Amino acid sequence: DDCLGMFSSCDPNNDKCCPNRKCSRKDQWCKYQLW
């Protein structure tokens, strides 16, 4: 499966962002997960 890169639009309920990234519920795109 291809993962979604930085700033790719995504679905918070079906997070397909790459490792160390998280789908932002507010902005609906993949952001770095800093925590």
From Swiss-Prot:
<feature type="disulfide bond">
    <location>
        <begin position="10"/>
        <end position="23"/>
    </location>
</feature>
<dbReference type="Pfam" id="PF07740">
    <property type="entry name" value="Toxin_12"/>
</dbReference>
<dbReference type="InterPro" id="IPR011696">
    <property type="entry name" value="Huwentoxin-1"/>
</dbReference>
<keyword id="KW-1218">Voltage-gated calcium channel impairing toxin</keyword>
<keyword id="KW-0872">Ion channel impairing toxin</keyword>
<dbReference type="GO" id="GO:0017080">
    <property type="term" value="F:sodium channel regulator activity"/>
</dbReference>
<dbReference type="GO" id="GO:0090729">
    <property type="term" value="F:toxin activity"/>
</dbReference>
<keyword id="KW-0528">Neurotoxin</keyword>
<keyword id="KW-0108">Calcium channel impairing toxin</keyword>
<comment type="similarity">
    <text>Belongs to the neurotoxin 10 (Hwtx-1) family. 59 (Tltx) subfamily.</text>
</comment>
<keyword id="KW-0800">Toxin</keyword>
<dbReference type="GO" id="GO:0008200">
    <property type="term" value="F:ion channel inhibitor activity"/>
</dbReference>
<feature type="disulfide bond">
    <location>
        <begin position="3"/>
        <end position="18"/>
    </location>
</feature>
<keyword id="KW-0738">Voltage-gated sodium channel impairing toxin</keyword>
<protein>
    <recommendedName>
        <fullName>Mu/omega-theraphotoxin-Tap1a</fullName>
    </recommendedName>
</protein>
<dbReference type="GO" id="GO:0005246">
    <property type="term" value="F:calcium channel regulator activity"/>
</dbReference>
<keyword id="KW-0960">Knottin</keyword>
<keyword id="KW-0582">Pharmaceutical</keyword>
<keyword id="KW-1015">Disulfide bond</keyword>
<keyword id="KW-0964">Secreted</keyword>
<comment type="function">
    <text>Gating-modifier toxin that inhibits both sodium (Nav) and calcium (Cav3) channels by inducing hyperpolarizing shift in voltage-dependence of activation and steady state inactivation. Inhibits Nav1.1/SCN1A, Nav1.2/SCN2A, Nav1.3/SCN3A, Nav1.6/SCN6A, Nav1.7/SCN9A and Cav3.1/CACNA1G sodium and calcium channels at nanomolar concentrations (IC(50)=81-301 nM). Surprisingly, selectively slows fast inactivation of Nav1.3/SCN3A. Also shows moderate inhibition of Cav3.2/CACNA1H calcium channels (IC(50)=1233 nM).</text>
</comment>
<dbReference type="GO" id="GO:0005576">
    <property type="term" value="C:extracellular region"/>
</dbReference>
<feature type="disulfide bond">
    <location>
        <begin position="17"/>
        <end position="30"/>
    </location>
</feature>
